[in-house]
Amino acid sequence: MPEFLDIRPLTRSAFAPFGEVIEADPASMRLINGGTTERFHALAAAEAAGEGARVIINLFRGQPRSFPYDVDMMERHPFGSQSFSPISGRPFLVVVSEDEGGRPGKPQVFFARGDQGVNYRRNVWHHPLMALGQTSDFLVVDRDGLGNNLEEFFFETPFVIKEPAP
């Protein structure tokens, strides 16, 4: 019998063990440019470690997932953080796991609104990008440099995500 995963709303407090939620936070807002622009300052910290490491900005185009969806693998990046911010304004799913002795534990699933992004801290187990509904573009900030910055883990028995409620 498959183990189904519940989908929870993405909140700063629930996501805190894994990284930061990127969203307009009134507490971090500063007016700049003569008062014509609101800057939401330092919402997440990019990490880039290792030889020749640098922070880069990418555009990812995610294809929508079909449901029910089997979560059969997780990945992590030992040398850098990785952030995803939707620029298509569409929601997406965020799947993360706590580390349990060098492997991912039971995944947790969060529903991110189209105005929320996430920053996975270095070494956080997460599932690859999960766009919903239609092809979606994401601004991705992560690390470039020498060394293998990808570790993958495949579950013997996948976990299952039911279709998210509209």
Curated annotation (Swiss-Prot):
Signal peptide: none annotated. Pathway: Nitrogen metabolism; (S)-allantoin degradation. Pfam families: Ureidogly_lyase. Its EC number is 4.3.2.3. It is an enzyme of class 4 (lyase). The keyword Transmembrane helix does not apply. Belongs to the ureidoglycolate lyase family. It catalyses: (S)-ureidoglycolate = urea + glyoxylate. The keyword Metal-binding does not apply. Its cofactor is Ni(2+). Keywords: Lyase, Purine metabolism. It comes from the Bacteria. This is Ureidoglycolate lyase. Homodimer. GO terms for molecular function: ureidoglycolate hydrolase activity; ureidoglycolate lyase activity. GO terms for biological process: allantoin catabolic process; purine nucleobase catabolic process. Catalyzes the catabolism of the allantoin degradation intermediate (S)-ureidoglycolate, generating urea and glyoxylate. Involved in the utilization of allantoin as nitrogen source.
